[in-house]
């Protein structure tokens, strides 16, 4: 056992990459990993250089890289550049994802009229781009690490409790949770027993993708937002920083015997029966 419990949570000397790293949740995760000692690659389709510059200005180790998680060729090119600079990747956080209005039911758009294109985009972004493709490309390098590593997918509370209005997103995130368990077993049994794969299932966090569902134009809770708060024992939406502790735990040696799990970070939403 390590001499100091703090050392078990330290990421000193480790290299981490985060897809969707310039987004609201991704940037918070990048900052947390860097504060724990990791050198962080911020991978995104835009704003990656600005995000990296912000962390560097805070005295942290970060670099930005372009990635399009929907294109395997672009992911491979990104991984090539990352490996040239980092030499090794110890931690992969698959944080890219989101929902789209055209895959969301509403009074104007019923389930029967949801366009296939919108549903396909949401599934592609959250399942293929949000988990499978980056894990294929970066995982191929990570299985070579003698000390293993950690892949962390971002699932959702929707994977446990499918929510109204967002069928594509709920289905995709349920698939991410299932894929997480599958990949954990596959990597451990076929390639490297020290390479772990887990997922975090956030509850309700305000992001650009879901804000229109939860907050109205007057910055008040929508009926849907009110219902969520009433069913969240913590009594609030999640803050991006609320994901950091769980992410560092899963990335560090402190969770070295943990693989194939999906950890809720939801303020108690999943545990509350409503009465």
Map each language-model feature to its residues:
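Short, small/polar-rich loop/turn modules that mediate ligand/substrate recognition or access, typified
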Residues: 191-196, 258-260
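C-terminal helical subdomain
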Residues: 126, 130-133, 199, 220-254, ...
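Substrate-binding pocket helix/loop in short-chain dehydrogenase/reductase
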Residues: 103-123, 228
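Short C-terminal tail/terminal secondary-structure segment
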Residues: 2-7, 247-248, 259-275
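Amphipathic alpha-helical dimer-interface segment in Rossmann-like NAD(P)H-dependent oxidoreductases
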Residues: 80, 121-145, 184-185, 189, ...
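Canonical Rossmann dinucleotide-binding motif of NAD(H)/NADP(H)-dependent dehydrogenases/reductases
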Residues: 8-41
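Active-site helix of classical SDR
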Residues: 135, 172, 180
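Residue(s) in the substrate-gating loop at a strand-loop-helix junction
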Residues: 156
């Amino acid at each position: 056992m390590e001499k100091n419990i703090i050392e078990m949570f330290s990421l000193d000397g480790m290299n981490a990459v985060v897809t969707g790293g310039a987004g609201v949740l991704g940037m918070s995760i990048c900052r947390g990993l860097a504060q724990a000692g990791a050198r962080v690659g911020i991978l995104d389709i835009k704003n990656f250089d600005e995000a990296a510059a912000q962390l560097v200005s805070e005295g942290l180790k970060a670099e930005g890289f372009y990635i399009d998680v929907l294109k395997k060729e672009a992911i491979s090119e990104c991984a090539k550049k990352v490996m040239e600079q980092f030499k090794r990747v110890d931690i992969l956080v698959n944080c890219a994802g989101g929902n789209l209005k055209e895959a969301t039911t509403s009074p104007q758009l019923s389930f029967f009229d949801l366009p296939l294109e919108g549903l396909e985009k949401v599934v592609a972004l959250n399942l293929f781009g949000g988990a499978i493709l980056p894990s294929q490309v970066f995982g191929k390098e990570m299985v070579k690490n003698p000390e293993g590593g950690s892949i962390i997918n971002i699932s959702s509370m929707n994977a446990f409790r499918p929510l109204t209005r967002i069928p594509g997103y709920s289905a995709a995130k349920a698939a991410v949770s299932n894929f997480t368990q599958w990949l954990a077993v596959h990597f451990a049994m076929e390639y490297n027993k020290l390479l772990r794969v887990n997922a975090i299932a956030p509850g309700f966090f305000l992001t650009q993708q879901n804000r229109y569902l939860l907050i109205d134009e007057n910055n008040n809770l929508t009926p849907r937002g009110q219902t969520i708060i009433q069913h969240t024992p913590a009594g609030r939406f999640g803050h991006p920083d609320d994901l950091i502790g769980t992410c560092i735990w899963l990335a560090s040696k402190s969770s070295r015997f943990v693989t194939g799990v999906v950890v809720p970070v939801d303020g108690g939403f999943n545990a509350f029966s409503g009465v």
